[in-house]
Amino acid sequence: MSRMISLREAETLAVAALEAVGVPRWEAEVTARALIDAERDGLASHGLSRLPFYLAQARSGKVVADAQARVEVAGSVIRVDARHGLAFPAIARGVERAIPLARELGLVAVAIGGSHHFGVAGAPVERLAREGLVAMAFSNAPSAMAPWGGKRPLYGTNPIAFATPRRGTDPLVIDLSLSKVARGKVMLAKKAGEPIPEGWALDIEGRPTTDPDAAIAGSMVPAGDAKGASLALMVELLTAGLTGSHFGFQASSFFEPEGEAPSVGHLMLAFDPAHFSDGYLEHIEALFQAMLEQEGVRLPGTRRHALRRERGESLELPEAVVDELRAYAVSRV
């Protein structure tokens, strides 16, 4: 069963729940909006189903609820210390500093350390693209994938995202996990008591499984097999390596309430195309038009933009999620 709820009500309830565990108002608003935007864009595995885990970790101290990200700028590098708080405020601080600096310098890097769940990787790059910048984002995560040929998970599912502005229309957004599917989809299947499709994950012995519990105990299958595993290693080095954060095998779970902070890393790059060549926006349209001339082709990000327009100012959520959200807010957790 599902139920309709307005974006405004969903945000109000989520903010109240976050504030109740000690998250300051601005940080609570940024986090709530990120989760609701994920729901609106059809990315429920990164949406409001994550909120109970954030709240439980804030209560236990695994997440520093009142953390306020610290920002330092050195040349073209923006360093953000998330201070073991929620990721979204740290991401927002980095993005807001990156926009003017990228316009000035042409290329900047935002390196975020000591952080938490990155959320929808396409969200911050889309924000940068709407400011006329070409952007990339990378994040590591707690271990869920083994090196190719191994059984012990060492890498996270480690998303990569890219976005570019387009003239007169929505940005093109590429957002992908380096596992065959995002691990959050396995968590949703577990919560619903449903099996997962074969090919998503392996059990602890390295055998294909459709049992979400066995998948969580085992490892996710990398997208593109050995190629995906190599890209996941690259992301570990770009994120945890460059920021001094925990590698996937060192990071604690985003889902378990107890333990030390996950302390993962993120890296974002923002390019101002005007510093690289003239007529970038016109030039890239030639490629997009050649793609769209072929039947069945759509540009990446099209689906999320369409869902956003279709859903407008309301969400259709599972009844259990709405009830849970209201209960957290009313009880002040």
From Swiss-Prot:
GO terms for molecular function: oxidoreductase activity. The keyword Oxidoreductase applies. Keywords: NAD, NADP, Oxidoreductase. It holds the Pfam family Ldh_2. Its EC number is 1.1.1.338. The keyword Nucleotide-binding does not apply. InterPro entries: Mal/L-sulf/L-lact_DH-like_ah, Mal/L-sulf/L-lact_DH-like_NADP, Mal/L-sulfo/L-lacto_DH-like_sf, Malate/L-lactate_DH-like. It catalyses: (2R)-3-sulfolactate + NADP(+) = 3-sulfopyruvate + NADPH + H(+). It is an enzyme of class 1 (oxidoreductase). SUPFAM superfamilies: L-sulfolactate dehydrogenase-like (SSF89733). Belongs to the LDH2/MDH2 oxidoreductase family. Catalyzes the reduction of sulfopyruvate to (R)-sulfolactate. Together with SlcC, provides a racemase system that converts (2S)-3-sulfolactate to (2R)-3-sulfolactate, which is degraded further by (2R)-sulfolactate sulfo-lyase. This is (2R)-3-sulfolactate dehydrogenase (NADP(+)). It comes from Chromohalobacter salexigens (strain ATCC BAA-138 / DSM 3043 / CIP 106854 / NCIMB 13768 / 1H11). The lineage of its organism: Bacteria, Pseudomonadati, Pseudomonadota, Gammaproteobacteria, Oceanospirillales.
